[in-house]
């Protein structure tokens, strides 16, 4: 009976994604979003002809062959890549080395091209959850000097360059994702300066040099999975945001994000208020958002609304 319910839920979610009309904007979107879609322990992302499956539970892993068959039926001719993080396998007591590696896919999002490579980037290969936020921010960058902090594979920075920013700099500590980011800039025939650095000393140096930007993006990786570590995570967010605010010119735009599900939106906004106070800056909040409609969350599971996005004007 449980398997029948899972199969019915899975089929319903695939149909619902069609109703959302996601293909009009992008060929990269989330097909199944774990408990938000009633399929806890399963995440599926579609990147053009490549479908990436991530298992978070032994139960979903046991049904993997049915899951693969259902995806191939819905996306004829697709390639399937599946994996599970080591910590999940240890926690859930199953062993999975993953399917055969697949070549990266080239996806298009609002006219901007990216390489989605599950073997060479964090998570399933591309952060489709930021699609709407990238598009919104890119409407405000023409002729502007843009700084993309914790840039990963260059999503916000490449968008900004495509949309006419005068200068774009991306900073990340991970050289592997920066190599993908440079490839993404090349795919779109735009110039972005990517720097491999820890953002803390980099921002302190920028402040010492009086270096300021019209638009600053701060999108760090998840801080913690442990409820006991939420307060230390908020302290790190505070330190990061305080430094990043110092790089925004007066009247500039600041976009800050948290993908730590255990950090609530009210906690994140309070952290941002304190960061503004300590940085001596006034923050005018323009927009508070999250992930796109292909990343639904359940009202009774608030931590499943993991992505917080805040866009501010800074004085």
What are these regions (language model features)?
Residues 239, 253-315:
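C-terminal catalytic and target-recognition region of SAM-dependent MTase-like enzymes
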Residues 153-166:
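Conserved SAM-binding loop of SAM-dependent methyltransferases across substrates and taxa
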Residues 32-45, 61-127, 135:
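Non-catalytic substrate-recognition/targeting regions of SAM-dependent transferases
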Residues 143-150:
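Conserved class I S-adenosyl-L-methionine
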Residues 176-214:
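S-adenosyl-L-methionine
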Residues 1-48:
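Non-catalytic accessory regions of SAM-dependent methyltransferases
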Residues 167-172:
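Conserved SAM-binding motif I beta-strand of class I
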Residues 177, 213-243:
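Mobile active-site "lid"/loop adjacent to the S-adenosyl-L-methionine
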């Amino acid at each position: 009976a449980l398997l029948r319910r899972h199969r019915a839920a899975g089929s319903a979610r695939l149909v619902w994604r069609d109703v959302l009309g996601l293909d009009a904007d992008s060929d990269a979107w989330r097909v199944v979003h774990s408990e938000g879609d009633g399929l806890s322990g399963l995440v599926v992302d579609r990147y053009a002809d490549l479908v990436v499956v991530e298992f978070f539970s032994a139960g979903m892993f046991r049904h993997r062959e049915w899951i693969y068959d259902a995806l191939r039926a819905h996306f004829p001719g697709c390639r399937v890549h599946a994996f599970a993080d080591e910590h999940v396998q240890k926690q859930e007591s199953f062993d999975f080395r993953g399917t055969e590696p697949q070549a990266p896919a080239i996806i298009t999002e609002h006219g901007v091209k990216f390489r989605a490579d599950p073997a060479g980037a964090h998570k399933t290969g591309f952060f489709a959850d930021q699609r709407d936020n990238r598009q919104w921010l890119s409407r405000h960058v023409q002729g502007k000097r843009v700084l993309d902090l914790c840039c990963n594979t260059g999503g916000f920075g490449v968008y900004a360059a495509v949309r006419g920013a005068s200068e774009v700099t991306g900073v990340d500590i991970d050289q592997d994702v920066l190599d993908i980011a440079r490839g993404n800039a090349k795919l779109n025939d735009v110039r972005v300066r990517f720097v491999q650095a820890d953002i803390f000393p980099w921002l302190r140096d920028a402040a010492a040099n009086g270096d300021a930007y019209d638009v600053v993006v701060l999108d760090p990786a998840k801080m913690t999975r442990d409820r006991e570590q939420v307060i230390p995570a908020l302290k790190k967010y505070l330190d990061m945001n305080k430094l990043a605010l110092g790089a925004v010119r007066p009247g500039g735009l600041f976009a800050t994000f948290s993908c730590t599900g255990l950090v609530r939106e009210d906690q994140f906004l309070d952290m941002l208020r304190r960061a503004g106070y300590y940085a001596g800056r006034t923050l005018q909040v323009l927009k508070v958002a999250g992930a796109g409609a292909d990343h639904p969350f359940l009202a009774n599971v608030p931590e499943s609304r993991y992505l917080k996005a805040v866009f501010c004007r800074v004085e």
